[in-house]
């Protein structure tokens, strides 16, 4: 997302992907809808799913504040406006492209305050070992992350994004990104990697242990 001070470095030789925060912050974010005008629908699906993950993980976060949640709420309202474009139900007009970028911008403003949480932390191993696109990999874990959250927080996120419940979100994820099968061995590796990062685990506002992480990862679930 725009307006964050974080870069992500992938090192294939080491099978590692991690975030690198810098003590810099952009003065300007260029939100020009023309950047998205020729993007294939699968690219829009994956990148807008990443933006949703930023927003949801910032809201359901131990570092969330009334101010960060104001950014999340604004971003989710913008994000919801472009769902039909990603679903292929209407064209990606210039206005729709700007709306998608604006949602991404609010996502960046949100995680700049809170950081991302467990879905992002679990996604890195999946991206490295299966080459799944980043946004799609984050979305892979979102349904179960939302299911673990406090019902009030979960319902706030889903309602703002225009979803009735976690299954409604999951149906959208499958329709746009598709749910690929990920080997349990890779998911178990994602869990073990995340357990070495207590700072990331601490950002989930509920008790987290290996059992919870395996549940969020969906280990043992049929596709």
Predicted regions and their residues:
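Short glycine/serine/threonine-rich phosphate/pyrophosphate-binding segments
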Residues: 1-3, 119
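Glycine-rich flexible loops
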Residues: 2, 53, 77, 101, ...
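Carboxylate- and glycine-rich phosphate/diphosphate-binding segment that chelates Mg2+/Mn2+
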Residues: 6-114
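C-terminal charged capping/lid subdomain of soluble metabolic enzymes
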Residues: 23, 158, 162-223
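Amphipathic alpha-helical interaction segments
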Residues: 70-74, 95, 99-102, 121-124, ...
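Glycine-rich phosphate/pyrophosphate-binding beta-alpha loops
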Residues: 108-133
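Active-site pocket-lining segment
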Residues: 125-181
